Design a protein with these regions (language model features):
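Alpha-helical segment of the N-proximal tetratricopeptide repeat
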Residues: 75-112, 123
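Structural motif corresponding to the intra-repeat A-B loop/turn of tetratricopeptide repeats
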Residues: 97-98, 131, 164, 199
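Basic Arg/Gly/Lys-rich low-complexity intrinsically disordered segments
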Residues: 1-74, 78, 85
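Structural register within alpha-helical repeat arrays
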Residues: 90, 123-124, 157, 192, ...
Length: 221
């Protein structure tokens, strides 16, 4: 190739001073590869990699889970079943110790591994709720309801709506809710009273709280 004056431009030679050095003799390359292999072998066997996610405390036993949860986890491969079960127990321990953020990390990892298991989504909803992550909790509780048809989470769904600043929507969620479980009924009344108070309906909120207290007393007798 020539420049404007017709002088030739020669391609630079490939040599030690350039990026592409001269090829090494075959024997030398072979010896270097053998040395590298020997060095790798001298390192010994690799240690097994640690599982992703938060470290599970010592002593956690998935057998502590409710039998219904254990039954759900049987749909998973055995190694994953044990890991997810331990994560759920660790989350429960963390909540008992008022370590809500740690509990959330455990259930987040459980959801990553087994997001199609209803009890896992339920656990993640509860830990999200305990961390005031109401939008996330709402999404999880709705997913559980779609998966199982279980309405027992309705009071928590309504309370999430309250947490998001939507008391009227919370009241709509509770409208027509008639749980058979007295404890869930009381929870719904308390959440409804809070929503009434948020909406400025303080007298109605007080009446609902009195009713909840009376119901609680009757249950204790």
């Amino acid at each position: 190739m020539t420049n404007g004056s017709g002088a030739s431009q020669q391609r630079p030679a490939r040599g030690p001073g350039n990026r592409r050095s001269q090829p090494q003799p075959r024997d030398k390359r072979h010896n270097e590869k053998s040395t590298h292999r020997d060095q790798r072998n001298d390192r010994g066997p690799r240690e097994p990699s640690q599982p992703r996610g938060p470290r599970i405390p010592d002593g956690v036993d998935p057998a502590e889970l409710d039998p219904s949860v254990i039954n759900e986890l049987r749909t998973l491969p055995e190694d994953m079943r044990d890991r997810v079960g331990c994560l759920l127990v660790a989350a429960e321990w963390a909540l008992e110790d008022d370590e809500a953020e740690s509990a959330l990390e455990f259930t987040k990892e459980a959801k990553r591994l087994a997001g199609r298991v209803a009890s896992v989504r339920e656990a993640h909803g509860i830990t999200s709720y305990r961390n005031a992550r109401y939008a996330d909790a709402l999404s999880e509780f709705r997913a559980v309801r779609r998966m199982t048809g279980d309405d027992s989470f309705i009071p928590m769904v309504a309370d999430c709506e309250r947490g998001l600043g939507r008391p009227e929507r919370a009241l709509d969620v509770l409208k027509g809710f008639r749980p058979s479980d007295p404890a869930v009924k009381i929870e719904a009344i308390i959440v409804g009273a809070g929503a009434r108070g948020d909406a400025g309906q303080h007298a109605a909120a007080l009446v609902m709280l009195v009713f909840a207290m009376a119901t609680s007393v009757l249950m204790a007798q």
